[in-house]
């Protein structure tokens, strides 16, 4: 059990990739805490994990609100102690017109998809520095490398995560803290399914360009994230891990 007794905190852990990460790190022996906006689903998942013999703790929280994340951090550290590994997974889609999007909408979106990465890191880093060890995995997206029309400003936020990851990796490496990014391609999560419902033509379009002829399952992304949290990845720092089945290798 490569994460035995390690406290791993996952944002947006009640669904999608986050849910798969919570399960996978729990299976690896971690004490896993997670937050989510969906209180009912979060509590049910916590109960499910505990019934299976895992150490799990759920607390509700909106990553886009700093005070809520401060409360979340206080709750999870009270339950399991300092955070050893952080997975910044929470986020949402955006489909704005760059002219019609309001400043308030911009701020609300960026608070969730970009600023929250820094906020959670800021909360967890002091203990990691003191321990001279820690791991952070930031979930970006293949949209940081290439994107679709009418997806503004999702790609901007996901690209920003890569720069933030590099900054943190360079600054925190001397403290024994590794910071990496994961860039999933199309993954069959509720958020992606929601996108396909709103844009049904995109499902067949997405499948048509997939070199492997399918999309990823959340657990396939989670396995890489878990690896990056373990000592098996002890010299992996500041890296961008693209997990897209080869999609980004296409020219057209």
Residue positions per predicted region:
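Active-site helix of classical SDR
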Residues: 121, 157, 165
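Residue(s) in the substrate-gating loop at a strand-loop-helix junction
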Residues: 141
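Substrate-binding pocket helix/loop in short-chain dehydrogenase/reductase
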Residues: 97-110, 206
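Alpha-helical segment proximal to the catalytic Tyr-Lys
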Residues: 126, 170-174, 234
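Conserved glycine-rich cofactor-binding loop
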Residues: 7, 14-15
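Short C-terminal tail/terminal secondary-structure segment
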Residues: 146, 226, 237-252
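Short, small/polar-rich loop/turn modules that mediate ligand/substrate recognition or access, typified
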Residues: 87, 173, 178, 236-238
